[in-house]
């Protein structure tokens, strides 16, 4: 399982197929431990100052084992970037699991809170990954990839569930989600003090979300209702 034989910048952001909401793409085992050690070092002391020897020492392994799993330092960097993307996609998955059927305003509020936590700490400071991305000069490219994979997750797994219970009032659903996520990132950069309520209104108006509460479907209702009940309102996810 040597990881450095792939293209060293980024794998294609669009897969041939999407992922299930239970699927994780994080590295595990020794390769995952090495990647996490590198991530910690990059965030503490910077990428340029971190050597493969440093990564091996942090992970408690030999340099030979690092090179067994990763062709070179660039491959380690790629793995860390992949892990950052996974952070963002998993935050969407966790948010989806926490939603209550019919509580559109509550779901949207939780969505905005998830967005803030993904990028900023409790004091409003950027997460350490932002510094790593800026040092690498990869902020814009990373944003494109992260938005694509996040919207892929939403589009493949959540949009149809919203449409099962709501009238969809927008076209180009996938593209509108890209606009919303890029827009939220830019809006918070311009105005870090903007309230969650204002961000919620931006999402609601842009996606034309139906904010009326819904009652849970009765047991034994339409086929598949049990599977989609929890995610039916899909606030913050996007109608189609």
Identify the function of each model-found stretch:
Residues 1-29, 216-240:
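N-terminal intrinsically disordered/low-complexity leader segments
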Residues 29, 33, 37, 41-75, ...:
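Helix-turn-helix
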Residues 33, 75, 106, 110, ...:
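Amphipathic alpha-helical interaction segments
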Residues 79, 93-123, 177, 200:
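Hydrophobic alpha-helical connector segments
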Residues 82-88:
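Short, basic, alpha-helical segments at the C-terminal edge of helix-turn-helix-like DNA-binding modules
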Residues 110, 114-145, 186:
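Amphipathic alpha-helical segments used for helix-helix packing
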Residues 168-190, 197-210:
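Hydrophobic alpha-helical segments that form the core
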């Amino acid at each position: 399982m040597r990881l450095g034989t792939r293209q060293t910048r980024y794998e294609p952001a669009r897969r041939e197929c999407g992922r299930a909401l239970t699927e994780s793409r994080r590295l595990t085992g020794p390769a995952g431990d090495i990647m996490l050690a590198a991530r910690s070092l990059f965030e503490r002391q910077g990428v340029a100052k971190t050597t493969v020897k440093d990564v091996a020492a942090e992970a408690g392994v030999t340099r030979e084992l690092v090179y067994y799993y990763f062709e070179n330092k660039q491959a380690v960097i790629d793995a860390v970037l992949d892990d950052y993307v996974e952070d963002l996609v998993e935050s969407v998955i966790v948010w989806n699991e926490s939603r209550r059927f019919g509580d559109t305003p509550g779901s949207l509020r939780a969505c905005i809170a998830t967005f803030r936590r993904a990028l900023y700490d409790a004091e409003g400071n950027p997460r350490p990954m932002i510094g790593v991305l800026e040092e690498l000069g990869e902020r814009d490219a990373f944003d494109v990839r992260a938005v694509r994979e996040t919207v892929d997750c939403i589009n493949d797994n959540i949009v149809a569930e919203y449409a099962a219970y709501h009238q969809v009032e927008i076209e180009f659903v996938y593209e509108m989600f890209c606009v919303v996520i890029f827009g939220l990132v830019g809006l918070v950069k311009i105005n870090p003090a903007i309230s969650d309520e204002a961000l919620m209104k931006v999402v609601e108006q842009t996606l034309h979300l139906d904010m009326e509460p819904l009652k849970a479907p009765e047991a034994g209702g339409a086929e598949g209702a049990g599977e989609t009940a929890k995610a039916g309102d899909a606030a913050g996810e996007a109608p189609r």
